[in-house]
């Protein structure tokens, strides 16, 4: 914004031009202040993230190209008169792409088929089909269940042996799970059932409930809603999947996340426990683990030889993905796709 202001001073821009360019940043700053002051509002979070995607990122692209072009022009003693136009062109392209992502892309469904192989997998589970869905964040769809029904139809069309959900059914409150969503998600079926674990949002800590008791009650309501849909919620526990005499252990933990600074008076739900989830599982058995945050995998899971495969969600590729690239790769070792540990 400073560079934009600096460039605008050279041109005859009226008051409304300044308002048009800087108002998004002011709105973003206001809601960012609310978030930093403890106003844990998903509405404010959406305003901040949406403004960054639609306005800040394109302006950043404009600034980098414009400033870089001017600096190179001075370095090589050339007058690049059209650099502002080039910068504006690329900024517009980025803005259009971002607009597509937050309007059309949010309802785009991709089915990724991944083959997991291991000589340790019981033979009866060769060809076993697991469908994983994650991070529905139902509050993002308000009362429109069309995309959720598309997801359900896609899942059922794959004829899975097992369906798993790896957390974040809601944004901040069980009130987001409207009856139409319950009806839709109740229609997912698989011979070995539908299992789920809780993600960080499912603990409802972002709603700003006034007490720990209310947070716990909200979390319990999320669990009951999932159970009412026919899902079995694994909270640091496991179940046995049996096929033709062979056994595969299905385990699930509550969210285990990277520690972060805690605000004064903030309630932080207890982390899930892999040890508790695998209590009683013999060393000879192998485990398919459900967890929410992939950070958990390298932190604890890879050191347990019983865990053969781990399924996680959470990252959303930071909501920005172009092919196999996402900025998430800069801050998350595991952000999407298949990863193999040599432990």
Protein language model regions, located:
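Conserved beta-sheet core of the metallophosphoesterase superfamily
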Residues: 186, 249, 288, 293-343
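Binuclear metal-dependent phosphoesterase catalytic core
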Residues: 1-7, 61-62, 66-67, 97-121, ...
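Active-site metal-binding loops of divalent metal-dependent hydrolases
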Residues: 134-138, 167-169, 200-202, 237-238, ...
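Membrane-embedded segments
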Residues: 107-112, 117-224, 229-232
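Binuclear metal-dependent hydrolase catalytic cores centered on His/Asp/Glu-rich metal-binding motifs
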Residues: 206-231, 243-287, 297
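Active-site-proximal beta-strand elements of phosphoester/diester hydrolases
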Residues: 113, 127-140, 247-257, 288-292
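Non-catalytic terminal accessory segments
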Residues: 1-107
């Amino acid at each position: 914004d400073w560079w934009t202001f600096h460039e605008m001073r050279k041109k005859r821009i009226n008051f409304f031009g300044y308002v048009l360019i800087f108002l998004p940043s002011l709105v973003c700053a206001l809601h960012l202040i609310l978030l930093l002051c403890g106003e844990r509002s998903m509405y404010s979070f959406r305003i901040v993230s949406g403004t960054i995607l639609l306005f800040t990122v394109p302006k950043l692209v404009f600034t980098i190209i414009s400033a870089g072009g001017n600096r190179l022009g001075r370095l090589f003693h050339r007058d690049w008169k059209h650099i502002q136009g080039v910068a504006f062109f690329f900024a517009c392209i980025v803005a259009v792409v971002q607009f597509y992502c937050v309007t059309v892309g949010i309802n785009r469904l991709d089915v990724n088929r991944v083959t997991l192989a291991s000589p340790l997998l019981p033979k009866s589970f060769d060809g076993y089909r697991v469908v994983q869905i994650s991070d529905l964040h139902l509050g993002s769809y308000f009362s429109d269940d069309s995309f959720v029904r598309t997801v359900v139809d896609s899942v059922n069309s794959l004829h899975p042996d097992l369906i798993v959900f790896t957390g974040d059914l809601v944004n901040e409150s069980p009130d987001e799970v409207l009856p139409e969503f319950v009806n839709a998600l109740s229609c997912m079926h698989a011979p070995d059932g539908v299992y789920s674990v809780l993600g960080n949002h499912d603990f409802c800590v972002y709603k700003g409930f006034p007490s720990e008791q209310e947070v716990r009650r909200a979390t319990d309501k999320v669990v009951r809603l999932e159970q009412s849909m026919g899902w079995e919620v694994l909270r640091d526990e496991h179940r046995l999947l049996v096929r033709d005499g062979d056994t595969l252990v299905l385990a699930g933990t509550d969210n285990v996340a990277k520690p972060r600074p805690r605000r004064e008076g903030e309630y932080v739900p207890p982390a899930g426990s892999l040890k508790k989830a695998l209590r009683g599982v013999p060393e000879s058995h192998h485990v398919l683990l459900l967890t929410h945050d992939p950070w958990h995998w390298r932190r604890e899971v890879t050191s347990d030889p019983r865990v053969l495969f781990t399924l996680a969600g959470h990252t959303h590729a930071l909501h920005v993905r172009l092919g196999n690239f996402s900025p998430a790769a800069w801050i998350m070792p595991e952000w999407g796709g298949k990863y193999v540990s040599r432990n």
